[in-house]
């Protein structure tokens, strides 16, 4: 499939947050590694879907920064990603506290947990407004360069 043929659809932010929160609760309640692994893979698929949509919007915006539709989409992502990161923190905590951590590390490597620990150290919900402002300033700078 060509990039130009890929369909962009803005996700419903509340549905995305609810899905991630639901997966987090399911991970916490998993009875065995196989169940936890299936939930993990579902979360990864959801994450890929969200990041693909964000990338489509970003690339299409960078092609023509005057395009009002994709300018609006870029603003949406600038505000949504920091909010999503707050919800993602709960997933990360659940992974770190999982009784199946050893099995996850054996299958996916210790880097999975090293990155998770770093993620928890580098984000706090209190900085969401600053992250959103940083994203907006970056977008304004990109427009100047274009």
Predicted stretch roles:
Residues 2-146:
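A well-structured
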């Amino acid at each position: 499939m060509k990039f130009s043929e890929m369909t962009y659809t803005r996700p419903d932010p509340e549905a995305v947050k609810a899905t991630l929160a639901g997966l987090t609760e399911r991970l916490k309640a998993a009875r065995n590694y196989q169940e936890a692994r299936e939930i993990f893979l579902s979360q990864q698929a959801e994450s890929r879907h969200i990041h693909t949509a964000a990338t489509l919007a970003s690339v299409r915006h960078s092609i023509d920064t005057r395009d009002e539709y994709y300018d609006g989409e870029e603003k949406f992502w600038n505000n949504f990603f920091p909010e999503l990161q707050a919800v993602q923190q709960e997933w990360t905590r659940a992974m770190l506290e999982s009784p199946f951590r050893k099995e996850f590390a054996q299958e996916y490597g210790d880097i999975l947990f090293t990155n998770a620990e770093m993620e928890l150290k580098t984000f706090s919900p209190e900085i969401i407004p600053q992250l959103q402002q940083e994203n907006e300033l970056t977008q304004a700078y990109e427009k100047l360069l274009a």
